[in-house]
Amino acid sequence: SLTPDQILSAQKANLETLFGLTSKAFEGVEKLVELNVTASRAALTE
């Protein structure tokens, strides 16, 4: 069976992976928002 230390390190690794994916998702959303704002401004100035 797993020791408490092994369980803790596995949970920590899972959390780090989750945070990494979450921050990447936020970066993607930010870029999309920037693109939409840029496109909207371009459409308004035409």
From Swiss-Prot:
Its main location: cytoplasm. InterPro entries: Phasin (IPR018968). It is found in: Cytoplasmic granule. This is Phasin. The gene is phaP.
